[in-house]
Amino acid sequence: MPIQPLSWVSIFRLGTVQLCLGAIVVLMTSTLNRLMVVELMLPAVLPGALVAFHYGIQITRPNWGYRSDTCGNRTRWIIGGMGMLAVGALMAALAIPLLEASFWTGLGVSVVAYGLIGMGVGASGTSLLALMATATAERRRPAAASITWLMMIFGIAVTAITVGQVLDPYSHERMLAIVAVVTGGAFLVTCLAIWGIERRAGVQAAPVAEPMRFMDGLREIWAERAARNFTLFVFLSMTAYFMQELIMEPFAGLVFQMTPGQTTSMSGAQNGGVFLGMVLVGVAATGLRLGALRSWVVAGCLGSAATLAGITLIASAGLKPLLVPAVITLGFFNGMFAVAAIGAMMQLAGQGRARREGTRMGLWGAAQAIAAGFGGLTGAALVDLLRNAMDTGAAFGMTFVLQGALFVAAALVAIRIMDGRATAQARVVPGE
């Protein structure tokens, strides 16, 4: 059966699945993280280690992608992964009151929960992106990548803002009810959105009778220079991107005495800024063909670094009214940087050896996950360490400065490996 490229409606349906992923994950990385640090007064390194563990589990992403390449059905991996993610998120929420009542019991439940979250995101997210790379017409891949990522950011922002509005006055019971509604709704919407797309597109191939061993397939992909260079770029840039993920809400709570609802809403506003940055680049670079994608990613990285320096100054001067606008600006520049990298990833996934789209997406997803875990844990650990030597505001500020330096380094790497021509499609130079 010949492949029928995805229609725009099908692309938006797949984007809805990405939206559901973001809606669940944001509860773990922002709301639950803040509750551990501020309400339960636990060290920031604890939620940092749990989130790093969930990212570490995602080192299995290449394996999930390879399985979906060879089993002939990506839909079941998408739905099954979303189910694991929903169950893990519910367990993570249940662990909050358990941590307060019995620390070790709560910690044990948290470890299992974050492990399920990592496996769910890896199985569902990798298979979803592989399906898109396989079934989307080449000319639509950059736009499809932008649409699905924007929908994920939209889901993150709307969930964070809405949860922030209904979470106050805070209670464990209210928090558990909110998480149950979000996770149950996300799983149901995913099943409805994905159903039938793979079969109608004609990409539900027969399973490979004698598939190559996973490690042999992974070595084939690593031998491709473009894939290898892009993996290194993803790791560095995502380390910078995720360093503030676990500390921004505690920063607002500890330095500016913001409530859980206020900091959750701030997180949603930041992701709203990411959304706007992605829209700008999508319209300017793809629609109007203004500037090269390399220029956009460099501008995003350097803008992020400058904004982090500004947030440090805001903290030292105690200018609370400027905090949320600065955080939105940081999100805006983050979005500029991210959308170009996503376009390049979608283009490269379909190049090279056939029936390896899932493995390539898994490789880059694993690099992103490792970097995210490393960056998040490093940010949290630095804050804990520096708070022993200086006041809280200065400790957060020093961490933000280091994150800004990594963004500058990522910009320099992008200049070396990305094509500087003004084009609507991202291209990575397969050399240095």
Which positions does each model-derived feature cover?
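Cytoplasmic membrane-interface "Motif A"-like loop-to-helix N-cap segments
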Residues: 70-87, 103, 286-302
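Short amphipathic helix-loop junctions that connect adjacent transmembrane helices
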Residues: 30-45, 246-263, 384
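C-terminal ends and interior cores of transmembrane alpha-helices
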Residues: 82-104, 302-318
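Glycine-rich segments within core transmembrane alpha-helices of 12-TM secondary carriers
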Residues: 57-58, 142-167, 364-378
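C-terminal transmembrane helical hairpin of 12-TM major facilitator-type secondary transporters
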Residues: 294-341
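A membrane-interface helix-boundary motif in multi-pass transporters
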Residues: 74-76, 106, 164-184, 292-295, ...
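Juxtamembrane intracellular "pre-TM" segments in multi-pass secondary transporters
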Residues: 1-8, 198-231, 255, 428-432
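Helix-to-loop junctions at the C-terminal end of transmembrane segments
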Residues: 59-73, 167, 277-293
